[in-house]
Amino acid sequence: MKSKSSRTRVAILGSGSIGLDLMFKVKASEQFDLKFVVGRNANSDGLRLARSCNVETSSDGLDFLKAHEDAYDLVFDATSAAAHKVNNRFFSDAGKFVIDLTPAKVGRLCVPCINLDDMGAEQNVNLITCGGQASLPLAYALKQAVDEIDYLEVVSAIASRSAGIATRENIDEYMTTTEYALAKFSDAKKTKAILNINPAEPGVRMQTTLYAYARYRDFDRVRASVADMVEKVREYVPGYRLVVEPLESQGRITIGLTVRGRGDYLPEYAGNLDIINCAALAVASHRHATARLGATQ
């Protein structure tokens, strides 16, 4: 077991479902020393749970982290897009590395299986959206295998119980940021993102379908590129798998996937939250390894 002095000191800002699932993931890792879980409501279920897990908590939000800035090195921001834009002013001035789990689009966009190695010097890394983390690997794989993508549409369906207040408040930002990232990572001429919140009980597992109109010469190359990318995602999101292999019909390509959560805190059907948290851990682990390598040279 690593000593605490060799671990990266972590603060989690946001005590909702994403923040709590992150708490369990961080506590299970020997790379990190979880210092704080910070929220806004002292009586919230999230902060009560964190306290019961022997984690120091505060309901003073960003003010608490300002007052304790020497006690942590890395922040997971699991608040909202609007809040993150305010929060990052302090984190940037204080030289804190931030992993942004909101669709604020302030920092460098990251999908670990695509561009994790480019994140070494970034102060702020943005994880786009849950639908983005699910669909962008396939969009990028498609780009590698076709000549041109004229239109790209992504439809994600998630369980209502996995869509918290922040998710519902950020719907507009979700669409805008996902569509922007789809265009950036696929070079598609036009993109569209749709999010369906399914009220069915028991909760349904996250599913994402990608539709594309593209020009290609060898569809076997598309299949191979997608299959290779799925394996790369599964290295940090074990529950990621295709349910519809790439299909073609008159220039239209369809690919379907599902994400089963790891069940660290959230139900297995909440793959939409699990995938963005797994991506966050991948980024944090990369930064930890980079920092430790630099310290030994």
Swiss-Prot record:
Molecular function (Gene Ontology), one example = NAD binding
Reactions that this protein is recorded to catalyse: acetaldehyde + NAD(+) + CoA = acetyl-CoA + NADH + H(+)
Q: Which keywords accompany this UniProt record?
A: Aromatic hydrocarbons catabolism, NAD, Oxidoreductase
State the EC number(s): 1.2.1.10
Q: Which residues form the active site?
A: 130
Q: Where is the signal peptide?
A: none
Q: Which SMART domains match?
A: Semialdhyde_dh
Q: Tell me which Gene Ontology terms the entry assigns under biological process.
A: catabolic process
Extract the coiled-coil ranges from the record. Answer: none
Binding-site residues for NAD(+), renumbered to this chain: 15-18, 162-170, 272
Where on the tree of life does the source sit, at the highest rank?
A: Bacteria
Q: Does the keyword Nucleotide-binding apply?
A: no
Record-stated family: Belongs to the acetaldehyde dehydrogenase family.
| Record protein name field | Acetaldehyde dehydrogenase
Q: Which organism is it from?
A: Burkholderia pseudomallei (strain K96243)
